[in-house]
A protein has these predicted regions:
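Walker A/P-loop
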Residues: 47-84, 113, 140
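Conserved AAA+/SF3 P-loop NTPase catalytic/coupling segment centered on the Walker-B
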Residues: 117-144, 173-182
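AAA+/SF3 P-loop NTPase mechanochemical coupling elements
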Residues: 116-120, 124, 131-132, 151-170, ...
């Protein structure tokens, strides 16, 4: 606890965070500018009674966690990642009273102590949109701008919080209480465009996969890259691209029994990944007239796609409609059209 409360000077150099993010995250110059602007605004309007809280909101696989790590590196601070998803009560923040069995300090204090961290750390609460009502209530108290400390029930003392930099990463902003959103700076992390994805695969993903699997001279043809991004890696981020590349490399190394001069082709993608995962715009003419099926438009940031919704009759089920998948809002209209 003595080390945790030790004060460490925080240095902020204007533009350093933006430069680091641009160098680390290909195709996210806009994100770098937004994050740097938010940190600069907090720095210029510095209030010793208020800690800095940023919210990185965007689709899965768009580099929110990596951005938090880069921010800590650029600011010269330590970094601690905590998974907020699944937290059921306030002990995550406040700890447990000593009179209760298996009592202990809050997870935040335990992890800071384990890493010999200080209260000047960058704390990343990941999956912040998957918390419970009680955990959100405790976090709302942590964000109180009028207090400089938060109280730990087990340690029975107040922990200074004003120098902490809190970064929340989440996918669905609608699940977060409005009272919390009012106390944080939101930075939207948009998905990658098709051209950005191509550049990321060529400049980053191929090198990353080659290093991981110790492959010399790894490449992919332009037609194969076009096919992969159009019909298989359909999510806004690049996480599914990396998973597909991993499958392709494992199969190629296994079949060719070598780790040199590997080239991913269209035939390899078709053979390993199988049928395409979603309908694209080119399929619209031949697929729209199929009974029980309708096309739906999906959008995330500046990325759009065309997907199919299918209705299947179950003779063993009573008169009821069940849906599966992430169908929300206007997407349900396409379901009724298909029926």
């Amino acid at each position: 606890l003595v080390h945790i409360t030790k004060e460490i000077p925080v240095q902020y150099e204007m533009g350093e965070v933006e430069q680091r993010l641009k160098k680390k995250r290909c195709g996210q110059d806009d994100l770098a500018g937004q994050v740097d602007d938010a940190l600069m605004a907090e720095y210029l309007s510095r209030n010793d009674k208020r800690m800095t809280v940023l919210g990185l909101w965007g689709p899965p696989g768009t580099g929110k966690t990596t951005a938090a790590e880069v921010i800590a590196e650029a600011l010269g601070r330590g970094y601690l990642k905590l998974n907020f998803g699944g937290t059921g009560d306030s002990t995550f923040i406040n700890g447990t009273k000593k009179s209760i069995a298996n009592a202990g300090p809050s997870l935040l204090i335990r992890e800071l102590a384990r890493k010999n961290g200080t209260y000047s750390y960058v704390i990343n609460f990941d999956e912040f949109d998957k918390g419970s009502t009680e955990s959100y209530q405790a976090f709302h108290e942590l964000l109180d701008p009028e207090s400089t400390c938060f109280y730990d029930e087990f340690l029975e003392c107040s922990i200074p919080k004003n120098d902490l930099l809190i970064i929340l990463t989440f996918n669905d902003i609608r699940k977060i209480p409005t009272a919390i959103l009012d106390r944080i700076r939101i930075v939207e992390v948009s998905g990658y465009s098709l051209s950005e994805k191509k550049q990321i695969v060529k400049n980053a993903v191929l090198n990353k996969m080659a290093e991981r699997f110790r492959v010399n001279n790894l490449s992919i043809t332009d037609d194969a890259l076009e096919l992969l991004l159009h019909e298989y890696a359909v999510m806004p981020g690049i996480r599914d691209v990396e998973r597909d590349m991993e499958k392709l490399l494992i199969r190629m190394i296994k079949n060719e029994k070598k780790c040199d001069n590997l080239c991913i082709s269209v035939d390899t993608i078709r053979e390993v990944l199988g049928s395409k995962r979603s309908l694209v715009l080119d399929d619209k003419g031949s697929k729209c007239a199929v009974p029980g099926q309708a096309m739906a438009l999906a959008v995330s940031g500046n990325i759009g796609s065309c997907i199919a919704i299918q209705v299947v009759q179950d003779p063993y089920q009573k008169d009821a409609v069940e849906t599966s998948g992430l169908l929300r809002g206007s997407c349900l209209e396409s379901l009724w059209d298909a029926m």
